[in-house]
Amino acid sequence: AEVIGADYAYLLFEFPPQQLPQAVAGLKALGAAGFNVTMPYKQAIMEYLDEIDAEARLLNAVNTVRIDENGRLYGSNTDYFGFRQSLKDAGVPVEGRRVTVLGAGAVSGPVWLTLSEERAGHVTWLNRTLDRAEACAAQMNRRSAGIADAALLTRENLNRQIRESDLI
């Protein structure tokens, strides 16, 4: 906040998942301008929000909540905007490219959405557990049919993808 001249503090609050409603009420009562959430709260927070942006709704995950002057809560997913902008800032073209994604964890949603919107040619998800990689590929294929596949993250699969991919 100091860097941009804003009078805000960024504080860490830890609480058990069952106390999420009280945490949200407490932040509103304190007059907080907003807050961030991480796992395991990215889906759970959604039921307490007054409005959710289209990308967060599509991803079924919110990580940033803004509280307006009337106490209304607005949710968004800044992982999506951050990943998309980092590709643009780096001048990395995605359209038509063969892409390999290593991992299928918590930020895989913003990755698959960005790669779909930027019209990647083909995306291979490599992960230590095949079911998570397949779930990411399935999400992409529901949005852009036939664009994605999945494989276990093994040395052999990784070496093949390094040779065959334009972007990793």
What spans do the regions from the language model cover?
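A general structural motif
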Residues: 32, 96-97, 120-122, 164-165
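Short, conserved SAM-binding/catalytic segment
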Residues: 136-145
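Receiver (REC) domain switch-region micro-motif
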Residues: 35, 99, 168
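Short, charged/polar "capping" segments at the starts of alpha-helices
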Residues: 44, 130-135
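Rossmann-like NAD(P)-binding element
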Residues: 152-168
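Glycine-rich adenosine-cofactor-binding loop
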Residues: 77-80, 87, 92-120, 127-128, ...
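Phosphate/diphosphate ligand-binding glycine-rich loop within oxidoreductases
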Residues: 2-90
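Short gly/ser/thr-rich secondary-structure transition/capping motifs
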Residues: 16, 85, 145-155
